[in-house]
Swiss-Prot record:
<dbReference type="InterPro" id="IPR002653">
    <property type="entry name" value="Znf_A20"/>
</dbReference>
<dbReference type="InterPro" id="IPR035896">
    <property type="entry name" value="AN1-like_Znf"/>
</dbReference>
<dbReference type="GO" id="GO:0043161">
    <property type="term" value="P:proteasome-mediated ubiquitin-dependent protein catabolic process"/>
</dbReference>
<feature type="binding site">
    <location>
        <position position="117"/>
    </location>
    <ligand>
        <name>Zn(2+) 2</name>
    </ligand>
</feature>
<feature type="binding site">
    <location>
        <position position="149"/>
    </location>
    <ligand>
        <name>Zn(2+) 3</name>
    </ligand>
</feature>
<dbReference type="Pfam" id="PF01754">
    <property type="entry name" value="zf-A20"/>
</dbReference>
<keyword id="KW-0863">Zinc-finger</keyword>
<keyword id="KW-0479">Metal-binding</keyword>
<dbReference type="Pfam" id="PF01428">
    <property type="entry name" value="zf-AN1"/>
</dbReference>
<feature type="binding site">
    <location>
        <position position="141"/>
    </location>
    <ligand>
        <name>Zn(2+) 2</name>
    </ligand>
</feature>
<dbReference type="InterPro" id="IPR000058">
    <property type="entry name" value="Znf_AN1"/>
</dbReference>
<feature type="binding site">
    <location>
        <position position="41"/>
    </location>
    <ligand>
        <name>Zn(2+) 1</name>
    </ligand>
</feature>
<feature type="zinc finger region" description="A20-type">
    <location>
        <begin position="16"/>
        <end position="50"/>
    </location>
</feature>
<feature type="binding site">
    <location>
        <position position="120"/>
    </location>
    <ligand>
        <name>Zn(2+) 2</name>
    </ligand>
</feature>
<feature type="zinc finger region" description="AN1-type">
    <location>
        <begin position="111"/>
        <end position="157"/>
    </location>
</feature>
<keyword id="KW-0862">Zinc</keyword>
<dbReference type="GO" id="GO:0003677">
    <property type="term" value="F:DNA binding"/>
</dbReference>
Length: 176
């Protein structure tokens, strides 16, 4: 009888060590830690659950009544300061920024096109070439001659040479 018990335990151990196919039937082997799913199917289910939780939270938030805005936003009162009686002007100080303090651009701000060639508008991605004039170019327009670069390479070169080779002038020798 003792040998029959050993045979049954060895049979269940051999069954447990055999790999099981994915429950979804994709053809890959599943793991008990992943609910007998393969890693790809398990990741998909986890992603769906996370998306569902986010959507559920968004729906609950939209149904939740928001308190009136007047409770949170209090308008700052205007402060009137009267200077000495010599001046007849009244100064009004407000907490709101004045229009002269904030500069307004006449043109609407456009996002910088750092991933496109300035000449042909071709997408360059990571292979874009940054020129010294500050623009990004494709492989065809990367040279200064091909895109009419406004950067003065000669002047910069002259400046670097002058900096690297300072003029050394010795004092004049005095004769007796």
């Amino acid at each position: 009888m003792g040998s029959e018990q050993n045979d049954s335990t060895s049979f269940t151990q051999s069954q447990a060590s055999e790999p099981k196919l994915c429950v979804k039937g994709c053809g890959f082997f599943g793991s008990p830690s992943n609910m007998d799913l393969c890693s790809k199917c398990y990741r998909g289910i986890c992603a769906e659950e996370a998306q569902t939780a986010v959507a559920k939270a968004a729906v609950e938030k939209s149904f939740k009544p928001s308190p009136p805005r007047s409770l949170f936003i209090a308008e700052p009162p205007a402060v009137v300061v009267e200077p000495k009686p010599e001046k007849a002007a009244v100064v009004v100080v407000s907490a709101e920024p004045s229009s002269s303090a904030v500069p307004e651009a006449n043109e609407p701000s456009r996002p910088a096109r750092t991933n496109r060639c300035l000449c042909c508008n071709k997408k360059v991605g990571i292979m874009g070439f940054k020129c010294k004039c500050g623009s990004t170019f494709c492989g065809e327009h990367r040279y200064p001659e091909t895109h009419d670069c406004s950067f003065d390479f000669k002047e910069v070169g002259r400046g670097e040479i002058a900096k690297a080779n300072p003029v050394v002038k010795a004092d004049k020798i005095q004769r007796f």
